[in-house]
Amino acid sequence: MALNFNSPTFQSIKTTRRPCSPLRSPRVFMASTLRPPSVEDGNVKKPFSPPREVHVQVTHSMPPEKREIFDSLHGWADNNILVHLKPVEKCWQASDFLPDPASEGFEDQVKELRERCKEIPDDYFVVLVGDMITEEALPTYQTMLNTLDGVRDETGASLTPWAIWTRAWTAEENRHGDLLNKYLYLSGRVDMRQIEKTIQYLIGSGMDPRTENNPYLGFIYTSFQERATFISHGNTARHAKEHGDMKLAQVCGIIAADEKRHETAYTKIVEKLFEVDPDGTVLAVADMMRKKISMPAHLMYDGRDDNLFEHFSTVAQRLGVYTAKDYADILEFLVGRWEIEKLTGLSGEGHKARDYVCGLAPRIRKLEERAQARAKQKAPVPFSWVFGKDIKL
């Protein structure tokens, strides 16, 4: 689930900031900007600061009156969103797909797993590890959802449908990192200590989705991300099958199925917002796309590579696990899913936002084609996750 948004493809898309819309509250607070350390100014990197700059952060941008919309949707969410959760007793668990340590055949099962993994290329493991690390940063994602005004879990055990969804979604997602982590541990193909360090760094750094405590922006972001993870895990499943590890293909495939179900829930929320507030919602979609959807693990660091996420995402792009084309395809899918082209009765700003969003995917594709044509072969980069081996970018 990776893509480099510092690439020429995305830098070339010029964006202009629109004037303050009805979506934004006049009461907006700016958090400080974290600057990366530099030799020139003598700064020393702080141990718990993100590996790269975090944008100037806007907070609480949703006008207070918009909160009433989410309060009014409690009954709808009960009947239409919580149905996309599975009862715990019907959910798969990581142990269903792993060698059973209580069985007499445990050692033989581990040997079989390691044998299957022997011929899988290192670059595939780089991408699989990156996906697993992204899943393991789950505490950050629950934290992010609980920053959203009007839908956060106010008590830690709130019984509003929004809070129930966030906790249960987190519980379902928790199985993904558990399963991939244990499979990779048993494979013997990766440096688990370096991976564990990367996870700790990532959770400590957090994420910067630029959702502004605004549930409009937050649910648009999660709609995009769940589809991105569905695509990414689906492609790692396909690659595992091609490399002959059918069990690993099953593992990645079952995770992809969860992501698809979660995508359905989040896209339904945004669909409902389009129904009750089309102008505010299309402005929010345009806002998120102007800012560009950053991947959840964009602050990834392993203690060695300051450009780890960029390198990981480049390998994912080369292998076709998650690409710039996928980014454009997701946008196009959501535009169709939410029927943005058919929106009527919009304000002047709403019309501009609709036209911008509907025309963006073709522009991204054209820019990516040009970037690929100009792309130069990059030197291989060592990845600590695979014991410092050089991996082609």
Curated annotation (Swiss-Prot):
<feature type="binding site">
    <location>
        <position position="173"/>
    </location>
    <ligand>
        <name>Fe cation 1</name>
    </ligand>
</feature>
<keyword id="KW-0934">Plastid</keyword>
<keyword id="KW-0560">Oxidoreductase</keyword>
<feature type="binding site">
    <location>
        <position position="259"/>
    </location>
    <ligand>
        <name>Fe cation 2</name>
    </ligand>
</feature>
<comment type="similarity">
    <text>Belongs to the fatty acid desaturase type 2 family.</text>
</comment>
<keyword id="KW-0443">Lipid metabolism</keyword>
<keyword id="KW-0276">Fatty acid metabolism</keyword>
<dbReference type="InterPro" id="IPR012348">
    <property type="entry name" value="RNR-like"/>
</dbReference>
<comment type="pathway">
    <text>Lipid metabolism; fatty acid metabolism.</text>
</comment>
<dbReference type="GO" id="GO:0006633">
    <property type="term" value="P:fatty acid biosynthetic process"/>
</dbReference>
<comment type="subunit">
    <text>Homodimer.</text>
</comment>
<keyword id="KW-0809">Transit peptide</keyword>
<comment type="function">
    <text>Converts stearoyl-ACP to oleoyl-ACP by introduction of a cis double bond between carbons 9 and 10 of the acyl chain.</text>
</comment>
<keyword id="KW-0479">Metal-binding</keyword>
<dbReference type="InterPro" id="IPR009078">
    <property type="entry name" value="Ferritin-like_SF"/>
</dbReference>
<protein>
    <recommendedName>
        <fullName>Stearoyl-[acyl-carrier-protein] 9-desaturase, chloroplastic</fullName>
        <ecNumber>1.14.19.2</ecNumber>
    </recommendedName>
</protein>
<feature type="transit peptide" description="Chloroplast">
    <location>
        <begin position="1"/>
        <end position="30"/>
    </location>
</feature>
<feature type="binding site">
    <location>
        <position position="173"/>
    </location>
    <ligand>
        <name>Fe cation 2</name>
    </ligand>
</feature>
<keyword id="KW-0444">Lipid biosynthesis</keyword>
<feature type="binding site">
    <location>
        <position position="259"/>
    </location>
    <ligand>
        <name>Fe cation 1</name>
    </ligand>
</feature>
<feature type="binding site">
    <location>
        <position position="176"/>
    </location>
    <ligand>
        <name>Fe cation 1</name>
    </ligand>
</feature>
<dbReference type="GO" id="GO:0009570">
    <property type="term" value="C:chloroplast stroma"/>
</dbReference>
<feature type="binding site">
    <location>
        <position position="262"/>
    </location>
    <ligand>
        <name>Fe cation 2</name>
    </ligand>
</feature>
<keyword id="KW-0275">Fatty acid biosynthesis</keyword>
<dbReference type="GO" id="GO:0045300">
    <property type="term" value="F:stearoyl-[ACP] desaturase activity"/>
</dbReference>
<keyword id="KW-0150">Chloroplast</keyword>
<feature type="binding site">
    <location>
        <position position="226"/>
    </location>
    <ligand>
        <name>Fe cation 2</name>
    </ligand>
</feature>
<dbReference type="Pfam" id="PF03405">
    <property type="entry name" value="FA_desaturase_2"/>
</dbReference>
<keyword id="KW-0408">Iron</keyword>
<dbReference type="GO" id="GO:0046872">
    <property type="term" value="F:metal ion binding"/>
</dbReference>
<feature type="binding site">
    <location>
        <position position="135"/>
    </location>
    <ligand>
        <name>Fe cation 1</name>
    </ligand>
</feature>
<dbReference type="InterPro" id="IPR005067">
    <property type="entry name" value="Fatty_acid_desaturase-2"/>
</dbReference>
